[in-house]
Amino acid sequence: LFTVTVPKELYIIEQGSNVTLECNFDTGSHMNLGAITASLQKVENDTSPHRERATLLEEQLPLGKALFHIPQVQVRDEGQYRCIIIYGDAWDYKYLTLKVKA
């Protein structure tokens, strides 16, 4: 069974600093890196387009970690994010919350 977990659900970050949001996943056996797609989506209440600012640190994927780096966090980055990991035909997601201290 493919599952995604988050070691930390809430991140409280000073405005202007960097943050790395972490999602962990367990493939249950040998990992085929080519079959993994990881994404972080901001959950928006409105329909305005949101430019994704998070960068996936791919070197951690073989360790079962999807790390998403957001540089120089701004108030507009605050909110709920959905971390989605797709592995072949299986997928799972978890929610993370980012709060910004101005």
Where are these regions (language model features)?
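N-terminal edge beta-strand
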Residues: 1-24, 28-29
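Ligand-binding face of N-terminal immunoglobulin V-set domains in extracellular IgSF glycoproteins
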Residues: 24, 51-99
